[in-house]
C-alpha cells in the first residue's frame, strides 16, 4: 500500500468511544473562531464555492470547464484530504414566507401583493423549494494550531485563485456558518432558530454541540433515526468504465434533503509514478514467467493471456497519463445521505437514487452496520471513516462534476422569474452591484415591456423606493394609476412644462454646471439642425451664451428666476457672429414657435412616489428633445431623494432614441455614470438593438452594464450581442425564436436562462400585457 494512503488511514483512526449522549456522537473535539475545527486526529476548514453554468454550456465550453476543474483538483495539496460536499436543503415555509413573499401593508395594493405571492408560491412549488449549496473541506493531520492557521492561509489563496479561474470563487466560511450547516441538517425545519455567540456560550457554560445536535440519534443496521426523521447513508460501490459527467448533477437534483460528498485523496506524483512502475514490473515479471512455462512445454508461439496483456496496457497508459499528460493519481470515495419523514418514504427514495446511478452504469449500496461511520464521512467534518476508495486519475475524478447551473437568490432582492434549467426562483438585488443600471432588450412581442412593468410593480409593492418613468409610447399609465401613481402628460397642447435650464442645488456634484447645461442645449439644437451639423464655432457660441444667461442668476445668488430657453435665444441674437443667426433660427421653433413647450418655467410637481412623464403626444420632431429634457429634470428629483436617503428607480422606454444623436447619447451616458452615486438605478428598454449598437456610447454602456435581460433577438442582433457580451452559442439558443417572457439574464458575471411569465387570469397580467384586447 502507498505511504500516502497509509498515512491518511492512520490519521483517520481515532480511539473508539461509546457515546453516552447525542452530543458525544458528534466528532468535533474543538472549534476556533476562524472556522478551524479539530475533528478526531485532524484539523479541518471549509470553503464555500458558487455554482457555474455547466448544464447550459456548449460542448466546447464544457470541455473548457472540465479542464479548469481538473486544474483545481491538481492544485489540491497532497498532504491533505479534500471533501467536496453538495447540500440540498428544502426551504423552510416560515423562512420562505418571511424572505420571499410580500407582506401586506393595508395601502389598497394588497390584492396585487396577493397575486404576486401566489405566482411566487406556484413557481417555488415547481422547483420543490430546494436550495443547493456547495462546499469544499480540507483536513490535515494534527500539528500546532499556529502552523495549522498558516497552512490554511496558504491554501485559502490557492483555492481562491483556482476556483476564480472557473468563475466560481471559493470563500472560507466562519465557525458559526459551519455549525449552521450541521444545525440545518440535524434539525430540519428549525433553520431560523440557530443562534451562536461563542463568548456568550463560554460564559454560560454551553457546549456548542448542544446548539446543533438533534433531539435523538439512533443507528440501525441499514438506516438511522434522527429527531423524528429517517436517514440512510449510501456509498458508490461500482464505477462505470466511462462515468457520465451528469451523474452527480442527476443525483443532487433529487428533490429531497440530502448531502452528497466526494472524498479526494491526492497522491504525490513521484510516489504514484513509483507505484505504477512497480506494478508494470510485476506484470512484466508475470508475463515472463508465463512465457518460460510455455517454452518448457515447447509452446513457442503461445499468445500472452488477455488479462495479463490488459493489465500491462492499462498500467502503461496510466504511467503515460502521470508522466506526459499532467494527470495525478487520486483516491476517491462517494457517499450520500438522504432524509425522509417515514421509513417507507426512505426506502422508496433509496430505490430512486440507486436507479439514477444505474442509468449511468454505476452502483450505490447501503452501508450495513456502518451508518454512523458513513454519516461522519458524508457530513463536512473533514473525516473519512469509510474505506471504499477507488483509484482515479485527475480526468476520471473531474468527471464527478459538482457544477450544474448558476443560481441567483439575493436576500431582499426582486423576483425576476425562474431559472430555466433548475426551475429555482431568480431573486436579484441590483443595489448590491457596482452599477445597478439595466438594459431590457428584445424584439417586439418578446416580453420586454411586460418585464419592465413587472419590475415596476415589484419595486412599488415590495419597497418604499420612488419610481419615475419616461413613457414615450403611452404604455405605462394603467399600471402607474393602479399602483397609486400620477401620470403627467407633456405635449405642445398641455399646461405642463419643464424648464431644461433649471439648476438644483448640488446639480454639478463637482463638475462645471455651465458646461453640462451647454452640452444639454447643444443636444437640443442638434436634434433641430440634424446630427453632426453643428460646427465648432457654433458650439463655442452656444457655450458662451449659456455662461452669459447664468451670470446674472449666479450673481443674484438665486434671488432671480431661472433663465429660460427664450432668454438664452435672446442672448444668442445679441452675438455679432454670423453663425449666431443660424443658431437662433434653429432655436426659434422651440422657444418662440409652436413647439415652445420647454421655453416656460417648470410647473410640474413630480413628488408623487410613482410618476409617469407621458411624452406620447410630443410628435416625432420634438420627442427626442423631450426625452433629454425629461431625463435632465428627473436628475433634480434623484438628488433630492439622495439627501432624504431614499432610493430612486428610473425607467426609460425606447432608449434607442437617445442614441440617434451624439449629444443626447452622451447626456444619457453621463446620467448612467452619475445616478449610481446618487442612489438611483436606471432601467432602459429597446426593441431596436441594431440601432443602439451603431452608437459607440451605447456599446460601451451595454458592455459595462451589470444587469441585462435579453429576450428573443433578431439574427443580426444576436451576432452583435454575442461578440459584445461573450455569450456562447448554447446560451444564444435561449434568445433564438424564444417564447415571450423567455431569455437570458446577466447579473455581474453570471448568465442564467430564465422564464418569467404572468398567468393570464390575473389582474397583474391585464395591467402589464400589450396584447390588444387583453390589456386594461
Predicted regions mapped to residue ranges:
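A short helix-turn-beta junction within AAA+ P-loop NTPase domains corresponding to the substrate/partner-engaging
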Residues: 484-488, 697-710
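Extended, folded cores of ATP/NTP-driven motor/assembly subunits in large transport
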Residues: 1-405
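Conserved lysine of the Walker
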Residues: 448
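Post-Walker A helix-loop "phosphate-sensing" segment adjacent to the P-loop in P-loop NTPases
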Residues: 458-468
